[in-house]
């Protein structure tokens, strides 16, 4: 549902101008989508590469602040280089968690996480001696977070101001550089979007009105990120995880007693334990997915948070005297503040979300992974490889593998799987194609044929009032009206949809094709009545009828063409395509 909505918004960011949205990300992602030929697969790859590279860079900056040798250092030993590369790879893998919950394209969540990673990397540079550009990167990161999720940007700005002010590490010069970075990023965004500051504010205000009418944020605590916790996945993983972890602890203790143990044996046993953890994760996700609860597996990342907090607390307790820990920081206590900020960033990411706090924080668990690998790597380097942090680190990496498996094996709707099921077919969508199961592909081909026979193009208005996903509208083509998708999930679905449609010109509403689900009691077809009562049976002709299987039910749906008389009824006679 969300991915097709965000793809329609990315493909047609200008279509939402009359009404507005609560984020600006589509204006920035749209040029990228155009550059890759409107191909969804290449857009996904671009988002994956951008996030993975940024996460790796942020991890390297954090490790440098902790005192681990820089990758560019000429005197870096092979073991140290391997440790740094491994840590960066862990961070890159963990960043992929943002593509869970059914969205694989770089949507608003991915853009917000990208901004937070820039904030963390810039903060590490600022707190490190002999490094420049940190405040500028922080400012750019805060603005990029705002483009993706404005509430998260406010949250991270407050966290930074409070933490740095408490440490007295915030100078006027640094604040000025940060504001300058944010201002430059804002100007670039507005130029790309072709919006004035007043237009941007009007756009965001309209989006806030839509969300308020829809009622998808039911309370202030939910807006602040303190929503319900879903831990069923953690309970499912509990026993297998403890068995794997217990095996590692026993092995780690024996290794500490015998440092001369063959490193090949150590590596092999570590690999076996991680693979066991990964296998447990895959099996658990599939087991949960069979009953439609695949997303519950994300709660396993709570373990990552607990270990990250334990690692940061250890630094707070033992200080920075151990082996020169934090010696590159401007002040030793700055490192502790940095680790605390990293532990809090997943919550900042969750602020403003309308899903479970567990799921939201899990998508930003990369910051917990960075805490673990940075602290462990420096601790092990400082005391000759015999570190009490190693157990926490490997456990954290194992948890990352468990959680990252959700990205590729997630069965959030209880049916989809990797690889695609037998009989799957490719259906043309925008500039590329999407592989769908046979039944859905048949509908997709029928919609493409209908679009061709009706001579529809990217300027043809299309409204989906099914109250379900926007996938069929995405396959059909055309441009959305009012909003890229009219949600039917919440109680305010009809008022919100009516407000969106009331902001578009009458000729567009009079000539728009409609996708309707008469068997769905939560459809939003009453919202079509703007200025006059519209009856989908009397004012539209049926172009195509089909049955869609969603949410374990069969739904009757239809593609409708407006009759010429609808324009006169709505008050714009003569309106034609």
Provide a role label for each language-model segment:
Residues 1-8, 16-32, 38-41:
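Extracytoplasmic catalytic/substrate-binding loops of multi-pass membrane glycan-assembly enzymes
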Residues 45-81:
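Transmembrane-helix motifs of polytopic, lipid-linked glycan transferases
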Residues 98, 111-129, 134-142:
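Specific aromatic-rich, kink-prone transmembrane helix
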Residues 102-112:
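Short acidic/glycine- and proline-prone juxtamembrane loop motifs at membrane-interface regions
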Residues 125, 155-187, 221-222, 250:
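Perimembrane helix-loop-helix junctions
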Residues 133-150, 156-161, 182-189, 342-351:
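Membrane-interface alpha helices of multi-pass inner-membrane proteins
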Residues 404-491, 511-523, 549-552:
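Short periplasmic/luminal acceptor-recognition loop of GT-C membrane glycosyltransferases, typified by
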Residues 511-577:
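Aromatic/acidic, Gly/Pro-rich catalytic loop(s) in extracytoplasmic/lumenal soluble domains
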């Amino acid at each position: 549902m969300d991915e097709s909505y965000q793809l329609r918004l990315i493909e047609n960011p200008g279509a939402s101008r009359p009404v507005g949205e609560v984020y600006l990300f589509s204006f920035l992602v749209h040029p990228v989508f155009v550059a890759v030929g409107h191909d969804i697969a290449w857009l996904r790859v671009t988002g994956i590469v951008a996030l993975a590279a940024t996460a790796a860079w942020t991890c390297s900056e954090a490790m440098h602040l902790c005192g681990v040798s820089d990758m560019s250092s000429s005197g870096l030993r092979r073991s140290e280089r391997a440790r740094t590369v491994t840590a960066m790879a862990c961070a890159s893998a963990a960043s992929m968690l943002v593509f869970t919950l059914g969205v694989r394209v770089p949507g608003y969540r991915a853009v917000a996480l990208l901004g937070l990673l820039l904030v963390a990397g810039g903060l590490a540079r600022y707190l490190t001696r002999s490094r420049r550009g940190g405040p500028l990167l922080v400012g750019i990161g805060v603005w990029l977070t705002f483009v993706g999720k404005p509430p998260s940007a406010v949250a991270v700005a407050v966290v930074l101001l409070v933490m740095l002010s408490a440490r007295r590490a915030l100078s006027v010069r640094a604040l000025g550089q940060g504001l300058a970075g944010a201002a430059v990023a804002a100007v670039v965004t507005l130029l790309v979007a072709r919006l004035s500051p007043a237009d941007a504010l009007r756009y965001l205000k309209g989006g806030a009105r839509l969300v308020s009418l829809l009622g998808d944020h039911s309370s202030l605590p939910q807006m602040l990120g303190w929503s319900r916790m879903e831990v069923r996945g953690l309970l499912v993983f509990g026993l297998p995880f403890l068995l794997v972890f217990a095996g590692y602890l026993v092995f780690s203790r024996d290794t500490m007693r015998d440092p001369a143990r063959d490193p090949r044996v150590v590596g092999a046993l570590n690999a076996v334990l991680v693979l066991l953890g990964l296998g447990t994760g895959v099996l658990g996700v599939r087991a949960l997915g069979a009953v439609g609860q695949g997303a519950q597996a994300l709660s396993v990342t709570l373990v990552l948070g607990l270990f990250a907090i334990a690692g940061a607390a250890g630094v707070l307790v033992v200080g920075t005297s151990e082996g020169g820990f934090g010696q590159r920081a401007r002040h030793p206590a700055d490192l502790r503040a940095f680790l605390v900020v990293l532990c809090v960033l997943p919550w900042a990411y969750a602020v403003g979300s309308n899903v479970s706090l567990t799921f939201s924080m899990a998508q930003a668990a990369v910051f917990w992974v960075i805490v673990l690998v940075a602290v462990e790597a420096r601790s092990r380097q400082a005391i000759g490889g015999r570190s009490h942090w190693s157990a926490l680190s490997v456990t954290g990496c194992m948890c990352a593998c468990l959680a990252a498996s959700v990205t590729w094996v997630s069965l959030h709707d209880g049916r989809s799987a990797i690889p695609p099921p037998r009989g799957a077919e490719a259906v043309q969508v925008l500039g590329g194609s999407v592989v769908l199961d046979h039944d859905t592909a048949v509908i997709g081909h029928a919609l493409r044929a209908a679009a061709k026979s009706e001579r529809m193009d990217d300027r043809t208005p299309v409204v989906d009032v099914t109250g379900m996903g926007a996938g069929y509208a995405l396959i059909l083509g055309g441009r959305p009206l009012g909003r890229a998708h009219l949600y039917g999930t919440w109680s305010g679905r009809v008022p919100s949809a009516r407000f969106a449609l009331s902001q578009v010109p009458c000729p567009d509403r009079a000539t728009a094709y409609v996708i309707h689900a008469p068997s769905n009691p939560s459809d939003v077809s009453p919202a079509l009545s703007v200025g006059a009562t519209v009856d989908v049976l009397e004012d539209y002709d049926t172009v195509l009828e089909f049955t869609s299987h969603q949410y374990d039910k069969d739904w009757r749906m239809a593609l409708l063409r407006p009759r010429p008389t609808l324009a006169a009824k709505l008050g714009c006679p003569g309106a034609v395509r």
